[in-house]
């Protein structure tokens, strides 16, 4: 009898794992896929998985290739089974190269590829401004920083090659500064805690010389017209980090959308949004959250009074840059118009 029960339990366990595998993999998924230029990891993950944020759970590193965590155009993504469990791995395209004595040999083409050629998790053109230009700073940081006085002969500063003057306390260890303009001040919609200040990236400068508290600057790059009063902060020593992977948060997250790029109130697919949770709460770059449309308040014409309708799941977003108390995220799916104060939770 004991053996029979063990056999039934084993069969049930196998059946459960088989069901779990079926639930993980998308119906009609391919067995392999050749990566094309313009693909994103989110697209590829969604080709194989019902829940693209489960990519880390099914990804299998191929130790036989260089940069095994990166995926390049031309790579072959394959669905394989290891110990009966589905795994996704990558095979790198091989090419023929001349060898000694007129022979040829196979060589991984990645040896001539640069890591910046790797596909990104989400479309870079949608988030580049928020990755490399703008940022969130603590209250008072901009007010305490140096500021633009004027251009040469008090002319408007137009762009690269112009000269400008700034006033304030400059740190001699920094020769490159970024120009910022103070933007929206963010507060938590529930607790009213001050979350940070949006610093809009305007351009970059190099310090030519410093006389007391006056600095002579050479404008290196501008994204908008530089104005008197714009602030200067040391340029961030960071590259555009597009190499991250879709994942579910490690902790329970209850967030809200507090702002949308461009200051609009409605949110749609590929909009950048700011949410009121960050590194302090355990959010990481690549984390995916489900967006819930806040339920309407309606009148109960039978019993009287007002009733809040349930929140409805209406989309997905991915966090691509985190700060202490808030994060930037890209809306990847939206099946209806979303808005500020809509909620974001674990998927």
Stretches with model-predicted labels:
Residues 2-7, 16-347:
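Surface-exposed, polar/charged interaction patches used for macromolecular assembly or partner binding
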Residues 11-12:
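Repetitive helical segments and hydrophobic/amphipathic motifs
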């Amino acid at each position: 009898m004991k053996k029979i029960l063990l056999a039934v339990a084993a069969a049930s366990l196998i059946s459960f794992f088989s069901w779990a595998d079926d639930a993980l993999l998308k119906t009609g998924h391919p067995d392999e896929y050749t990566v094309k230029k313009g693909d994103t990891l989110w697209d590829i993950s969604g080709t194989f998985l019902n829940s693209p944020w489960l990519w880390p759970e099914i990804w299998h590193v191929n130790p036989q290739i260089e940069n095994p965590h990166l995926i390049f155009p031309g790579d072959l993504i394959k669905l394989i089974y290891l110990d009966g469990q589905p795994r996704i791995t990558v095979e790198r395209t091989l090419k023929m190269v001349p060898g000694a004595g007129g022979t040829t040999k196979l060589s991984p083409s990645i040896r001539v590829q640069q890591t910046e050629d790797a596909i990104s998790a989400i479309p870079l053109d949608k988030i580049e401004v928020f990755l490399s230009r703008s940022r969130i700073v603590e209250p008072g940081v901009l007010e305490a920083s140096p500021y633009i006085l004027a251009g040469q002969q008090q002319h408007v500063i137009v762009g690269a090659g112009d000269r400008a003057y700034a006033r304030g306390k400059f740190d001699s260890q920094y020769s490159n500064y970024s120009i910022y303009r103070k933007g929206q001040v963010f507060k938590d919609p529930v607790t009213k805690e001050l979350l940070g200040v949006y610093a809009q990236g305007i351009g970059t400068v190099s310090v030519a010389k410093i006389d007391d508290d006056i600095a002579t600057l050479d404008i290196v790059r501008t994204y908008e017209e530089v104005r008197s009063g714009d602030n200067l902060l040391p340029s961030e020593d960071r590259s555009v980090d597009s190499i991250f992977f879709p994942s579910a948060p490690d902790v329970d997250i209850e967030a809200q959308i507090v702002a949308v790029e461009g200051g609009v109130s409605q949110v749609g697919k590929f909009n950048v949004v700011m949410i009121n949770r960050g590194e302090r709460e355990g959010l990481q770059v690549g984390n995916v959250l489900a967006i819930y449309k806040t339920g309407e308040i309606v009148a109960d014409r039978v019993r009287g009074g007002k009733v809040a309708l349930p929140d409805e799941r209406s989309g997905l977003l991915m966090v691509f840059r985190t700060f202490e108390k808030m994060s930037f995220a890209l809306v990847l799916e939206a099946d209806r118009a979303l808005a500020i104060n809509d909620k974001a939770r674990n998927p």
